[in-house]
């Protein structure tokens, strides 16, 4: 008897849906085993039990069918080829740079760096924390101030945060006026003016010299100016200080290698972009902004701050310091709504400084400056004199034949800054060569000018000429710490990067089940286009006709996201979820204002909301009213209805997350939307949990008016260890006219003249291909299956853990959505073991903790995502069950409450190399289950003392001896 051969069709053999299988973790057999445990026949039957039928979509979303990786990459490559990457001399905060290949391959393209999460669990994040401390030290050294944060979203955002800091700390309390020099980058002015409008601040934009003539609480000055001018502003700063004003300086980081630091000139805060330290322009981002200030203003500093503390062995250890300033704790009273920043890009910039060191940076900066001097001298000898005699890298010329020069430039594949009438500006950078300068002579002067770069260089050397005033030549040392003077060969640099990487736990090691964070697969194919030169090397203000590849990709992605969200229009400008919230709330405010309802300023927020919600509402000057939740964790409908009706005359909106932050599909969500609309408000549906909606329902279908999407959650952009992120917003048509625009690049004719929320017109555009490929590879079926499996995995974990821990909230049929909350409070009551103890103990099992104490104190919120296999889920469940058994030994008295594996966790190699006198074995400490022995992750420090770190704040690199293990 012969077996019948099964013949597949060609369509099946072409594997067009193969990526779905690669992305979704559980195999068919694993899925069936989980369904058996859950008591359902199929994934679809489970979904029917969980998602309310009245909000279910009838059909799959109208996006493309899935593609193979080869096909999707080839198609996107064809789109990218539509971009025309010219030699760029536009400047304005975006410069060509040479990313060292050792950093490109081993950091930007390395999942050990890009798949980690924000270092809330510092014992397993010492590598990137050390690199971020290097970043802070770099910023402190170059700016001449005392304290730095670990990055902000972009230069414009940092400038807006500087304005907010100035208002908080200025002693000129009666003033509501902020001054901006007219030589600040136009996009920065745009972002700051938008923020000021929402804060109710007045703005004056004028020549910097006029600042002291105004009664201001603060001022923003560019150094060097957007025009390239380098000016000694120390006397001006002193005058502003005499009038009790605060001065923020927006500085070019490369120029500070040669120029006197803003701190030495008297600045109170310094902001800027670290992009030109090895991070590609990427059509606007992502890039890490820096923010430094004086120690006395540390409590007002926005963003993450990395500080030095001690672990339980007294060893120096790093952590995020002073978190009580931040939105996840202070909510509406936070300094900023910034949550995720730009950690991956800050680390790239820090490694750039480490690799080149002070001498290497000086060589690069001097080369850029010398080429600018050669260009300036050459043109001057032919009668074309730069407007400013003092500059670093940017020359501005008044020209009568502007159109002719621009035409020659375009013919030579070169872009200049041309937005000022009668002027062109040319900014040189690290990529500029002597051949480029020779070409610039041809463009500016026409052929036959007879200028020779080498001859001009000889003249400059012989004359000792300097276009930097003597009073502004940097004399103070930079980057003196040994870390910036030790790793200048590629061998040493590679090993240093690897040494730091090995200290961190990321998705390349194990599941990270952080609730509300969606730590899913960031597929390698999706990451590849980020470093394609067609995407990486495009200036955000390049002529639009040169960026047709970006336009095509962004337009197609926006169309897909509109379909998946049920909205009518998308804006890609917000470069984080927090920025998306801010932009969406601005749209709501402007909409009410357009209808004569500017008095509508009350925002209802459920008690369970993420801290960014109230912090964002405060940024648009809304008043926050909290809506209660019932004992099931759902919005208390009676309380909502009463407050909406009571506040109807002034109701602006509600901010609500769906599924709820408690991990449940609330069956009343459509009714909630109706109540708000009936009382004149708008519905802001936070997109944090879109991974439980895509393909099954949508915010627009539910009845919401606006949402932001966390592309770094639902749509596969990696978290980068704390950024980058992207937070585009979708809106219904009535809100579309109020989306952000841009000062230099009109995003949409319908939004022309609107303010910006980010420095670049499309935010961090170079990471949008990740989301584009996520959707293209999965297709309509795959993106829907991803949602279904996220729900399936979460319910499997919830069911298994419910046999050992209370599950705090569930929906109908006892099911959860895509995440669940495990209640640990009874264990604390019975044993003294805290959620912190359990989080640290999970490190010994090779896992990052779930989200701790949010949205309910004393709990874990677990979100496994669709990308994890049953094998990995079972490994995590085993760890949690074993930890519960360990707690029982504390409860029974077998282990003392202050001497047990949980209290002493995490355990390090140092612990087991010393005499062992603990009541549990070494094996119980570090190899508690068999699975750990095959893939042991060793924390490099013991538990860190948070209180010591905040009481003894050190946010710069400690002595080199402290790095010795």
Swiss-Prot record:
Single GO molecular function: glycine binding
Class in the EC hierarchy, top level: oxidoreductase
- Identify the EC number(s): 1.4.4.2
Q: Which reaction does it catalyse?
A: N(6)-[(R)-lipoyl]-L-lysyl-[glycine-cleavage complex H protein] + glycine + H(+) = N(6)-[(R)-S(8)-aminomethyldihydrolipoyl]-L-lysyl-[glycine-cleavage complex H protein] + CO2
Q: Which keywords has UniProt assigned to this entry? A: Oxidoreductase, Pyridoxal phosphate
Q: Which residues carry this modification: N6-(pyridoxal phosphate)lysine?
A: 713
Kindly state one GO CC term assigned in the UniProt record: glycine cleavage complex
Disulfide bond residue pairs:
none
A Pfam family for this UniProt protein? GDC-P
Swiss-Prot/TrEMBL cofactor(s): pyridoxal 5'-phosphate
Name one process (GO BP) from the record.
glycine decarboxylation via glycine cleavage system
Subunit = The glycine cleavage system is composed of four proteins: P, T, L and H.
**Chain's role:** The glycine cleavage system catalyzes the degradation of glycine. The P protein binds the alpha-amino group of glycine through its pyridoxal phosphate cofactor; CO(2) is released and the remaining methylamine moiety is then transferred to the lipoamide cofactor of the H protein.
Q: Which family does it belong to?
A: Belongs to the GcvP family.
Q: What is this protein called?
A: Glycine dehydrogenase (decarboxylating) 1
What organism is listed for this UniProt entry? Colwellia psychrerythraea (strain 34H / ATCC BAA-681) (Vibrio psychroerythus)
Source gene? gcvP1
């Amino acid at each position: 008897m012969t077996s019948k051969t099964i013949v597949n069709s060609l369509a099946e053999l072409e594997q067009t849906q193969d990526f779905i299988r690669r992305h979704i973790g559980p195999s068919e057999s694993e899925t069936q085993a989980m369904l058996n445990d859950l008591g359902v026949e199929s994934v679809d039957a489970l979904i029917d039990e969980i998602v309310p039928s009245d909000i279910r979509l009838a059909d799959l979303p109208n996006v493309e069918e899935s593609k193979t990786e080869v096909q999707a990459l080839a198609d996107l490559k064809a789109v990218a080829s539509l971009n025309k990457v010219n030699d760029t001399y536009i400047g304005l905060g975006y410069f060509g740079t040479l990313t060292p290949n050792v950093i490109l391959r081993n950091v930007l393209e390395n999942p050990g760096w890009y798949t980690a999460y924000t270092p809330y669990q510092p014992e397993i994040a010492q590598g990137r924390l050390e690199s971020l401390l290097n970043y802070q030290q770099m910023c402190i050294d170059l700016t001449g101030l005392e304290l730095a944060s670990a990055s902000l979203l972009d230069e414009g955002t940092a400038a807006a945060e500087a304005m907010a800091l100035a208002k908080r700390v200025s002693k000129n309390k009666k003033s509501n006026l902020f001054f901006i020099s007219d030589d600040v980058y136009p996009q920065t002015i745009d972002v700051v003016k938008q923020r000021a409008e929402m804060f109710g601040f007045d703005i004056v934009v004028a020549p910097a010299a006029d600042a002291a003539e105004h009664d201001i609480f603060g001022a923003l000055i560019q150094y060097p100016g957007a025009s390239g001018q380098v000016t000694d502003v120390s006397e001006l700063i002193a005058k502003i200080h005499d009038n009790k004003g605060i001065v923020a300086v927006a500085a070019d980081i490369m120029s500070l290698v040669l120029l006197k630091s803003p701190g030495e000139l008297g600045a109170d805060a310094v902001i800027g972009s670290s992009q030109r330290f090895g991070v590609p322009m990427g059509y606007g981002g992502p890039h890490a902004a820096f923010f430094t200030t004086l120690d006395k203003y540390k409590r007002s500093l926005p963003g993450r701050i990395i500080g030095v503390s001690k672990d339980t062995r007294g060893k120096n250890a790093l952590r995020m310091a002073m978190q009580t300033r931040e939105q996840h704790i202070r909510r509406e009273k936070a300094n900023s709504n910034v949550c995720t920043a730009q950690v991956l890009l800050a680390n790239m910039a820090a490694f750039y400084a480490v690799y080149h060191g002070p001498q290497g940076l000086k060589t690069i900066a001097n080369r850029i400056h010398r080429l600018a001097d050669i260009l300036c001298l050459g043109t001057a000898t032919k009668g074309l004199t730069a407007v400013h005699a003092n500059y670093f890298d940017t020359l501005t010329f008044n020209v009568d034949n502007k159109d002719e020069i621009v035409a020659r430039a375009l013919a030579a594949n070169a872009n200049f800054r041309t937005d000022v009438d009668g002027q062109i500006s040319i900014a040189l950078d690290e990529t500029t060569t002597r051949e480029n300068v020779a070409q610039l002579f041809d463009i500016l002067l026409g052929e036959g000018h007879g200028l020779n770069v080498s001859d001009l260089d000889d003249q400059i050397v012989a004359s000792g000429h300097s276009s930097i005033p003597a009073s502004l030549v940097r004399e103070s040392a930079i980057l003196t710490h040994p870390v910036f003077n030790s790793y200048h060969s590629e061998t040493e640099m590679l090993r240093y990067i690897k040494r730091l990487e090995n200290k961190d736990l990321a998705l390349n090691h194990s599941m990270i089940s952080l609730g509300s964070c969606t730590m899913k697969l960031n597929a390698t194919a999706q990451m590849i286009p980020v470093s394609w030169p067609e995407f990486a090397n495009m200036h955000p203000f390049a002529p639009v006709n040169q960026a047709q590849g970006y336009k095509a990709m962004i337009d197609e992605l926006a169309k897909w996201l509109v379909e998946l969200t049920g909205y009518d229009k998308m804006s890609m400008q917000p470069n984080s979820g927090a920025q998306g919230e801010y932009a969406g709330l601005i749209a709501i405010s402007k909409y009410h204002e357009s209808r004569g309802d500017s008095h509508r300023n009350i925002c209802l927020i459920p008690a369970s909301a993420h801290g960014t919600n109230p912090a964002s509402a405060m940024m648009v000057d809304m008043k926050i009213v909290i809506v209660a939740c019932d004992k099931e964790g759902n919005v208390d409908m009676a309380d909502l209805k009463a407050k909406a009706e009571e506040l109807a005359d002034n109701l602006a909106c509600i901010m609500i997350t769906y599924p709820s932050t408690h991990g449940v599909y609330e069956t009343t969500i459509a009714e909630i939307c109706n109540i708000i609309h009936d009382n004149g408000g708008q519905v802001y549906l936070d997109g944090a949990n879109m991974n439980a909606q895509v393909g099954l329902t949508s915010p627009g279908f539910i009845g919401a008016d606006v949402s932001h999407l966390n592309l770094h959650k639902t749509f596969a952009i990696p978290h980068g260890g704390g950024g980058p992120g992207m937070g585009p917003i979708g809106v219904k048509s009535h809100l579309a006219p109020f989306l952000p625009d841009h000062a230099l690049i009109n995003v949409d004719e319908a939004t022309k003249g609107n303010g910006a929320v980010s420095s670049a017109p499309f935010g961090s555009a170079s990471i949008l291909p990740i989301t584009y490929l996520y959707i293209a590879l999965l297709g309509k079926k795959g993106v829907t299956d991803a949602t279904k499996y996220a729900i399936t995995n979460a319910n499997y974990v919830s069911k298994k853990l419910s046999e050992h821990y209370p599950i705090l909230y569930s929906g109908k049929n006892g099911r959860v959505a895509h995440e669940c909350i495990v209640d640990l409070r009874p264990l604390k009551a019975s044993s003294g073991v805290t959620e912190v103890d359990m989080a640290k103990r999970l490190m010994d099992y090779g896992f990052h903790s779930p989200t701790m104490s949010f949205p309910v104190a004393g709990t874990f919120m677990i979100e496994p995502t669709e990308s994890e296999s049953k094998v990995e889920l079972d490994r995590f469940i085993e760890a949690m069950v074993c930890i519960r058994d360990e707690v029982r030994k504390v409860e029974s008295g077998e282990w003392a409450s202050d001497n047990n594996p949980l209290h002493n966790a995490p355990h390090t190699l140092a612990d087991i190399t010393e005499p062992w006198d603990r009541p549990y074995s070494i094996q119980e400490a570090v190899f508690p289950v068999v699975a750990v022995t095959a893939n042991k992750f060793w924390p490099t420090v013991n538990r860190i003392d948070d209180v010591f770190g905040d009481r003894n704040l050190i946010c710069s690199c400690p002595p080199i001896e402290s790095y010795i293990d």
